[in-house]
Amino acid sequence: MSKSFQPTRLVGAIAIAMGCSPVIFAEDATNATQLDPIVITASKSAEKASEVPARISVISKEEIEKNPVLNLSDVLQKDASIYIKQSGGVGQLTDLSLRGGQTGSTLLLKNGARLNTQNGLGPVSPEFINLSDVDQIEILKGPASVQYGSDAISGVVQLISNNPTKSGASLTGVYGENRTYKTLVNADYVDDSGFYASIGGQRMETDGTSIINIQDKSEKAAFDQKGYNAKIGYSNDVINTSLAIDQNQGTNNYTTNYSTNNAKRNFENRLVNWLASYKASSDLVL
């Protein structure tokens, strides 16, 4: 008989933030939420969400940060159009699909780069994706195969990372049951010339729980993940260019065919992304 587990309940959290300003005040609620955000997924160019001729929803950075462990599955399942099927607790494989479609018909992007696997089985597991540098998640609901190909028949989920706007650094730590912990560190540099740089790292580890109840107590669904992201760029009124790298790797224990012994899976994903644009006029951006 198999058991169903919910994601680990957090029992403690610490956060230390260091920035240019010694005191940080909460923004007024009316300013914290952007009522008409700028999106790029629908037409591959920046436009207001209200002007997009398609159904699209946006998850803001504030909503992402409400999940202390920055788990993509937990963030996405708040949207009614997203179906999440998780095979156990933290770090176990998760299927993601849009509006009742097949997993392989939902496209996952980060800054325009595809994160779907090459075998047509759909996006890489959301558990293996680092959200520490993500500022916005756009969910395009409905067929988008004309823009993105056959694996976007159900829709597109895109993770957007924006450029840093001020110099500063932060350190965050989270601890929970089953010896679960996650640490994140990030540092940004911005100067008046338009140059900027950002670097961050994260580590998550948990002992997990037994996947099925016939297993020995020592056979647990452990998960170990670490990664980093770095970005440099230059931006002014005419030119915008950047080079970014995102590396994520680790191991997770899982069970196959309800056997009594767990197997170990190693995972690694690396994303290198170069972007450049030139504003030729007020109406033309190349």
Language-model-derived ranges and their functions:
Residues 1-67, 73-77, 188-189, 226-228, ...:
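N-terminal Sec signal peptide and the immediately downstream disordered periplasmic leader
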Residues 31-33, 81-92, 114, 121-122, ...:
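Short, glycine-/polar-rich solvent-exposed loops and beta-turns at beta-strand/coil boundaries
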Residues 36, 94, 155, 169, ...:
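Hydrophobic, lipid-facing positions within transmembrane beta-strands of outer-membrane proteins
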Residues 73, 77-113, 135:
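Extracytoplasmic beta-strand/coil segments of soluble accessory domains associated
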Residues 100, 161, 189, 234-236, ...:
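Residue-level signature of outer-membrane beta-barrel architecture
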Residues 113-141:
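Short acidic/polar hinge/loop motifs at secondary-structure boundaries
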Residues 158, 166-167, 174, 186-267:
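Periplasmic-side early beta-strands and strand-to-turn transitions of outer-membrane beta-barrels
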